[in-house]
Design a protein with these regions (language model features):
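Alpha-helical transmembrane segments and their membrane-interface exit regions
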Residues: 51-61, 76-79
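Membrane-helix interfacial "entry" motifs
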Residues: 14, 37, 60-65, 97, ...
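Transmembrane alpha-helix interface motif
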Residues: 1-42, 48-57, 142-152, 156-159, ...
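Juxtamembrane/interface alpha-helical elements of multi-pass membrane proteins
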Residues: 73-187, 194
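Alpha-helical transmembrane segments and their helix-start/interface "positive-inside/aromatic belt" motifs
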Residues: 25-26, 64-74, 249
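Transmembrane helix-loop junctions in multipass membrane proteins, especially transporters and channels
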Residues: 41, 45, 60-64, 88-96, ...
Length: 268
């Protein structure tokens, strides 16, 4: 299950999406997520899925690989679904179980929230899979650069966010190694109910934290050895600049938003 995590990983390639400016990809990802959260019906989510599928095909990413990235988050998605189903108020009852009444409005809201989480993860995964860590850092820094007038540490924050994002697959890989090592010594992580399996994961925490701090210390020493001093007077190997590909991406996103808006007006 851990190997299915796609968030934070980079998939090298030379597609149109890979060659786009990281600033534009960040902006378009945010706009896409906001657009998805504005959708209020199933046809709108079908449009969002179709648009995402086209982007994935253009970027050369395996769509099945992206879908598998949802698997490790199925418990969070299921928990969100059940929470909204049980506690969201509604007026059209569908089923009564004791003192709990399930309504049509609650069912719709639960489905919509679950779909939003799925599109949030998949959209963010497309961004990280098509953008290298260095490009992501430069893009975040350039987008936040106007805040430097207020003494905001744009470069440092961008670096922290990128390192944290890139640490996700590393920590998951380390967890998988530790789990396999303990299973070779007789540990059982697969039998029993969900609570028992959760308790069996507790012995993984200590070696995982030790490994995480060791990696963080190694990274800090490597940056110190290279005389890293933050973003002041920092040069770049490749300067960022917008191209026709970015204009094409912005136009495609505008078309997506127009379709979402028109569909909402027609069915709303």
């Amino acid at each position: 299950m851990l190997k299915d995590i796609t968030l934070g990983q980079f998939f090298p390639g030379d597609s149109v999406v890979h060659r786009m400016d990281p600033r534009m990809k960040l902006i378009l990802t945010i706009v896409y997520i906001v657009g998805v959260f504005m959708v209020g019906n199933l046809p709108g989510y079908a449009v969002a899925l179709g648009f995402l599928y086209l982007v994935v095909r253009v970027s050369g990413l395996p769509f099945g690989y992206l879908v598998r990235g949802i698997k490790p988050l199925r418990f969070i998605i299921l928990f969100t679904f059940v929470l909204n189903l049980l506690f969201f108020p509604g007026e059209t009852p569908l089923l009564t179980l004791g003192f709990v009444t399930l309504t049509r409005e609650a069912l719709e809201k639960a489905i919509f929230f679950a779909l939003r989480l799925v599109f949030l993860v998949m959209g963010t995964s497309v961004l990280t899979l098509t953008t290298s860590p260095m490009q992501l850092t430069d893009g975040l820094e350039r987008l936040m650069s106007p805040l430097r007038r207020f003494r905001f540490p744009a470069h440092e924050l961008a670096m922290m966010m990128t390192i944290a994002l890139r640490f996700i697959p590393l920590l998951l890989e380390e967890t998988d190694k530790i789990q396999k090592a303990q299973m070779a010594r007789g540990a059982d992580f697969e039998s029993g109910n969900l609570l028992m399996r959760a308790k069996a994961m507790v012995p993984l925490l200590v070696p995982l934290f030790v490994s995480a701090f060791r990696r963080a210390n190694d990274l800090a020493m490597a940056m110190e050895a290279r005389c890293y001093r933050g973003g002041d007077h920092r040069t770049r190997l490749r300067e960022l600049k917008y191209t026709r590909l970015d204009a094409l991406g912005a136009a495609a996103m505008a078309c997506f938003l127009l379709v979402i808006f028109a569909e909402g007006r027609l069915l709303g």
